[in-house]
Amino acid sequence: MAAAKTLAVIFFILLTGAVACAQALTVFPVMIPLSRGQKATSLTITNKGTSETAVQIRAYGWSQKDGDGDIQLTATNLVALSPPIARIAPGASQVVRLILRQTPEKREATYRILIDQIPPPAEPGVVHIVLRMSIPIFAQPEVRSFADVQFHLERKDGQIDLVAINAGNLHELIRDIVLTTSDGRKLKAESSASPYILAGATRRWHIAAQDSLPLSSETLQLTAHANSGAIEEQVRFVQAQ
């Protein structure tokens, strides 16, 4: 959908000869970890453009739909942001303060801050391209926290999925997934928009096979990288649900 919107804007610009203008905004940090018991922090938005810009800052609860890891956002009042709207002069920065109203008890709480650039008034012959940035927040629970990701393979509808179930109470980040067959063939997972698997979530990665797929009786070698370190383990097929 985002790609379609981008192509539509480009087509409009080419068709009309309009000038495309986009403000350069940066945010720091790009990920916000809140340690056990921590309730307050801040982030900084900097306008690197040549004109004033306005932004709206909102917080949402963040969960994952089991399977593809799509970001699911829900309204929340558990994160307070100040200011919620800001005007930033060129070359200037705005500090946004964040307060967590409720600390999680048993499982890591996850949120996302959406920073939306507010478009300026319309100008003849000018298309303003506005920015949206999404910043993840990870709030550790009061109890001891860890990720516990278990992997297996499923065969369904002529394709193979690598399935990961995070039974822990902390998120994990998984990337660079490769499966090696018994005859040495390398099978890579299809790219995913998000590398995260949240606490209690299930993720699926489709495995692209250039030749024949491995047999369901075969055990494959999994290698990947995670926050907790390198992953190297054998994975087996189980009956698809």
Positions of predicted regions on the chain:
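A short beta-turn/strand-edge loop motif at beta-sheet boundaries
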Residues: 51-53, 168-173, 213-215
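Asparagine-centered strand-capping/turn motif at beta-strand->loop junctions
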Residues: 45-49, 162-168
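Terminal connector regions
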Residues: 101-140, 144-147, 212-241
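Short, solvent-exposed loop/turn segments enriched in Ser/Thr/Gly
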Residues: 36-42, 95, 108-111, 158-160
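Beta-sheet-dominated interaction scaffolds and their linkers
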Residues: 23-49, 85, 143-155, 194
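Surface-exposed binding patches on compact interaction domains or structured appendages
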Residues: 23-26, 48-95, 177, 183-185
